[in-house]
């Protein structure tokens, strides 16, 4: 029996290593790998990219674009984990749960662009509310997120974990202070916002896991929209989703904190709606593993859909 061949271009980076670990013991796919001395050889990479059934690109943006250019075999399908193609109209956005029928779009796609980690949480919260008309498209969205330092890739991991670091890393590093984070166009486009959201990301002094929050002022929403309606919309949208759950309102009301590491090691996304009707304020939250649903887990979920596993969504 012939099994689909998967080539991970960039399998030594943070995301590539995680995807390889998720696939190496599976018996339904065959991993095509290059010897260490050939991993950066353009000719050998091109050979592998054209010999596989599905190529998974775990590369910097420029290298990912180059890799796509190497592909001449029309049968090769691609999952790109970089941000190079996330707003390109000829690539299918790899968030199966974001819209009805979207898992099938991924299943039949030739080119799939894996979502960014922060956009996964932001789009997961915003898109259903915008589609339902509960949140105006021109709402001034503000997004705050803290990720484990692995979200910064190998350089950040080395900086936080190196015993030889001259200066100990800060417990919290707010970054993107120029307000030009590369995830902003992706969030705006796939959430369906009319304007750029205000996005403030940070790295915490822990390895992995994200907590992302979006404050909502009910007075700026259409008349009659309440926190309960926002929650009901999200709960209905994700009712059949295998990897997305919405915390019941009563559980959210009883919560005292959000743990960014709560879903580490999973491919799950947990959404929450915290309501203070008396103040007219709501806090939307998303908790997930930046290396799971925010990266490698999402890539493998998309791979499974492309291989015909409808249960992946």
From Swiss-Prot:
EC number, as in UniProt: 1.2.1.38
Pathway the protein acts in: Amino-acid biosynthesis; L-arginine biosynthesis; N(2)-acetyl-L-ornithine from L-glutamate: step 3/4
Family: Belongs to the NAGSA dehydrogenase family. Type 2 subfamily.
Signal peptide: none
Tagged with keyword Cytoplasm: yes
UniProt source species: Burkholderia cenocepacia (strain ATCC BAA-245 / DSM 16553 / LMG 16656 / NCTC 13227 / J2315 / CF5610)
Catalysed reactions, as listed in the record: N-acetyl-L-glutamate 5-semialdehyde + phosphate + NADP(+) = N-acetyl-L-glutamyl 5-phosphate + NADPH + H(+)
Gene Ontology biological process: L-arginine biosynthetic process
An annotated GO cellular component: cytoplasm
Stated role: Catalyzes the NADPH-dependent reduction of N-acetyl-5-glutamyl phosphate to yield N-acetyl-L-glutamate 5-semialdehyde.
Active-site residues per Swiss-Prot or TrEMBL entry: 117
Database matches in Pfam families: Semialdhyde_dh, Semialdhyde_dhC_1
Record protein name field: N-acetyl-gamma-glutamyl-phosphate reductase
Source taxonomy: Bacteria, Pseudomonadati, Pseudomonadota, Betaproteobacteria, Burkholderiales
GO molecular function: N-acetyl-gamma-glutamyl-phosphate reductase activity; NAD binding
Subcellular location, record wording: Cytoplasm
Keywords from the named record: Amino-acid biosynthesis, Arginine biosynthesis, Cytoplasm, NADP, Oxidoreductase
PANTHER family the UniProt entry points to: N-ACETYL-GAMMA-GLUTAMYL-PHOSPHATE REDUCTASE, CHLOROPLASTIC-RELATED (PTHR32338:SF10), N-ACETYL-GAMMA-GLUTAMYL-PHOSPHATE REDUCTASE, CHLOROPLASTIC-RELATED-RELATED (PTHR32338)
CDD domains: AGPR_2_C, AGPR_2_N
HAMAP family for the chain: ArgC_type2 (MF_01110)
């Amino acid at each position: 029996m012939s099994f689909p061949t998967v080539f991970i271009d960039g399998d030594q980076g943070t995301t590539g290593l995680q995807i390889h670990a998720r696939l190496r013991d599976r018996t339904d796919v065959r991993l095509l790998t290059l010897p260490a001395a050939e991993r950066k050889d353009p000719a050998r990479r091109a050979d592998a990219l054209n010999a596989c059934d599905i190529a998974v690109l775990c590369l910097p943006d420029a290298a990912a674009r180059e890799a796509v250019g190497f592909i001449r075999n029309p049968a090769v399908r691609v999952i790109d984990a970089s941000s190079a193609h996330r707003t390109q109209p000829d690539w299918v956005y790899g968030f199966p749960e974001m819209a009805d029928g979207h898992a099938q779009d991924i299943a039949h796609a030739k080119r799939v662009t894996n979502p960014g980690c922060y956009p996964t949480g932001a789009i997961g919260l915003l898109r259903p509310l915008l589609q339902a008309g509960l949140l105006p498209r021109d709402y001034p969205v503000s997004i705050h997120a803290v990720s484990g330092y692995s979200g910064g890739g190998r350089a950040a991991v080395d900086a936080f974990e190196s015993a030889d670091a001259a200066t100990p890393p800060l417990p919290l590093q707010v970054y993107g202070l120029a307000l030009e984070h590369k995830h902003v166009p992706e969030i705006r486009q796939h959430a369906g916002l009319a304007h750029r959201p205000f996005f403030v990301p940070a790295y915490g002094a822990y390895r992995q896991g994200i907590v992302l929050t979006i404050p909502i002022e009910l007075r700026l929403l259409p008349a009659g929209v309440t926190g309960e309606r926002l929650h009901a919309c999200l709960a209905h949208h994700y009712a059949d989703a295998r990897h997305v759950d919405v915390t019941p309102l009563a559980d959210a009301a009883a919560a005292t904190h959000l743990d960014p590491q709560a879903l580490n090691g999973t491919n799950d996304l947990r959404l929450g709606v915290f309501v203070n009707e008396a103040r007219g304020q709501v806090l939307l939250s998303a908790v997930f593993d930046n290396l799971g649903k925010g990266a490698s887990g999402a890539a493998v979920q998309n791979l499974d859909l492309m291989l015909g596993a409808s249960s992946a969504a």
